[in-house]
């Protein structure tokens, strides 16, 4: 395959001797070409017919990229060869990453995962059902008479973030500071390194954790800080690293997914009408939107030399496993760029795969379904503001920078 240079040669790492030149495809996960067409469209170039299932990019220090769903799933499942010890790219970010349990492999990971499940599992989500519903309705109703909003700022951020802050027992006035730090970890703007953002997050968490070890409540941080792993109390360091992960997950992923989904619905009145006329399809629509607008791309590190699908990988190589590419793989989903709410089999790895399947998926799905139902009930007809240029940002968690929406208040419905 002809080498495609997407990033300037000045930023390209030397090609390791074990990497064949025909597998080189210089894709920059933080600045892909054609990003203006949409972040998923920009990543879909990795699945064009002339691109191998496994490629090497010299961008961001140099790493492998699995481009097909089968390889992505196999690597997620095979933690003996593909370790979570260094899950972020570039390497310096991955080496600084020490959140628990996502930086661990089985069996060590399992006890911590069981503790995390106590704070974000289905029973917790069920208890939050009324609060989720109330907050969604309140936010949408406050926007409805205005006829316009920046959906990202006015709904996609405050809705899931306020739910998480409630779950964690943290004050809402801390949201701007925490959101800035999590953004620097997943879509950095250059103002902080990953390590600096992580340490700032830990500086915030340490006194809170110590306070709740002394006076525990029923919130997520108290449960983690006073939890048991492997038959012993969790240490302060372990609690800090677990709570750090909860904050990063709670303040970033659903925020961005909601904006991607609403951008699509704003441009597609026929899909909106389908859900208005057939609200029972909303759960299926949620799953199809999760497939089409998946947004996470994390990685693994090779624990030993290993031949994978005919390609020789070396110990210490990093491999990017873009979760979005499973759902966009035409080998798994026919016409993958097309959104079909009646799709019979929806295949994706939006919440990961294998031992690190996202524990927050139940809360995420609930928040998405409630948003679709309550928004379309109140504001059925809306569009992108005239002249607005929607910008996406690519990274470990991709996002929509701003989403200006408009509608005629006369067509809305107070509920």
Swiss-Prot record:
Its EC number is 1.14.15.1. It is found in: Cytoplasm. It comes from Pseudomonas putida. Its cofactor is heme. Keywords: Cytoplasm, Heme, Iron, Metal-binding, Monooxygenase, Oxidoreductase. One of its GO terms (cellular component) is cytoplasm. It comes from the Bacteria. This is Camphor 5-monooxygenase. It is an enzyme of class 1 (oxidoreductase). InterPro entries: Cyt_P450, Cyt_P450_B, Cyt_P450_CS, Cyt_P450_sf. One of its GO terms (biological process) is (+)-camphor catabolic process. One of its GO terms (molecular function) is heme binding. Pathway: Terpene metabolism; (R)-camphor degradation. The keyword Nucleotide-binding does not apply. Heme binds at residue 358. Its main location: cytoplasm. It catalyses: 2 reduced [2Fe-2S]-[putidaredoxin] + (1R,4R)-camphor + O2 + 2 H(+) = (1R,4R,5R)-5-hydroxycamphor + 2 oxidized [2Fe-2S]-[putidaredoxin] + H2O.
